[in-house]
Amino acid sequence: MLVNKYHFPFDTIREQQSQIIDELNKIPPEKKYIFLQCGTGIGKSALAVTMGKTAGKAYIVSTSKQLQDQYVKDFSNKGLVTMKGRSNYPCFVLDDKSDCSKGPCIGLPEIKNSCKEHCSYYKQKELANKSQLFCTNYAFLLSSGDLKKRDLLVFDEAHNIENEIISFATINIKPLRTLKKVKKTVTKDDFIFCTRISIDSTKDEIADFVSVFSDKYILPHIESLKGDIALLNIEEKSSKIISALDHITKELKLFESLYNKITMFNSRPEDYCFETLYDGDDFVIKLTPLNPSRILKTYTDRLANKVLFMSATILDFEIFAESLGISTDESAFLSFESTFNPELSPIYNLSCVDLSYKNLDNKDEIDSLIKTIDFIVKQFPNDKGIIHTGNKTITDILYDHFFDDERFLFRITTIENQVIYNDHITSDKPTILVSSSMLEGVDLSDDLSRFQIVCKLPYLSLGDKRIKMKTEMNNKWYELQMWQRLIQSCGRSTRSENDFSKTFILDRLFNRAFFNAKKRGILPQQFEKRIISR
């Protein structure tokens, strides 16, 4: 793949960035897929822009709106235009408080033609379509069926792509609850039909039920909702009309999404993991794609001539490519180490607790956990930090012991990550974040965190049927998922070359996992150099 340094977006190109471009130019042109692992600090976003501008027109896909905003901040003067979901744009057909996710054009396409010139959402989409670099997020890309083919498709933070696709395509149906939503009067035949599936039903029976259920109840309800929108006097713009429209469009989007997912499922039900679970008086049919490969291929074939996967944590190229259904014969893999000094961010392997599921009520293990955390935080009386708990149960255990210490900010059922993060960055006190879900996407640079504690290695739950099935098929995939999550979490508190922090890993399982990963040669050297074992 040819990459022209002339298109580099900054005045100065770093030596390592120049080297990466030279290596990219050595890749045979017939390779459609490029996997580029760039350690923290290299500046992979600038490389994505360089490749996109050289290619001609490109999509750049990120995991979050925050990362999109960073792309805009850095590259909006380089031909990059960002595109987000409807809820980010005001709807001028309604009042100044409503956004485009509530717009009547969702159910009435003919309205779109009349307001397209004035609609902030469609105007932004038109700008993005005309731009050289169309920057968006995974959710928008996966839910948009009208995007045109470009020369290059860049997946940033590509280690998340499997989770993004699986989350997007997973189907959850509660037949009786759904039936009550879509029918004003539920007949005896309706009830009998919706209760014919049980936890003992076969895959074929479930697949047949879902297909018929979709055509019999979901599709007619979608048409009914569109009819309800058409009956509203939109021009009145009263609070009653706007409230009704908000309710209808939310329900319409929900059912259209469900119908589209079922249509995807109907084409190849054998690719899915089937589950039926009781939920009170109802039950849940959960259908999860076992692998993202088929869905990913429909997007890559439709949207780009070449595809670039970028991440700091691809780690195992063969396992990663296999999990996406991509042949190594049509791929190229390049890896470059982080420029950060490992001595500034040591990781202390304490190996002092075993917090496996069977030990979560083991008094000795819990006492050891509490004492170790208490000792560590007292070494940093004036510093902020973060504790990665590993799961909600451990978060609750720590909450029970430290809830009266005002330093600790807990992610518990009623308090979201964003709330405690905002409290953390605005507080003058040496606060400590405690969460099981701040492994990535959180910037704790400089004094926002000088230490972090990893209580338990972030293995995916084997209680999830799909995870268990994939692990039984290939345990290396399971280990890879853990290492991607762990390395990401260990990077939350050192965000620049001169930044520094200390990380403490408490999990006794780390020794074995680290030995096996080193043997496989999948860990970045910079990460290995950070490890200090006692």
Model-derived segments and their meaning:
Residues 47-50, 54-93, 392:
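Conserved Walker A/P-loop ATP-binding site and its immediately adjacent core
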Residues 351-364, 413-513:
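Conserved RecA-like P-loop NTPase helicase motor core
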Residues 44:
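Conserved lysine of the Walker
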Residues 127-142, 426-440:
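Conserved two-lobed SF2 helicase motor
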Residues 84-89, 138-140, 389-393, 409-422, ...:
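Conserved helicase motor
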Residues 115, 121-132, 142-152, 297-301:
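Short basic/glycine-enriched coil/helix segment immediately N-terminal to the Walker B
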Residues 131, 138-139, 157-161, 165, ...:
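Conserved Walker B
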Residues 2-9, 15-25, 29-39, 77-111, ...:
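Conserved coupling segment at the C-terminus of the helicase ATP-binding
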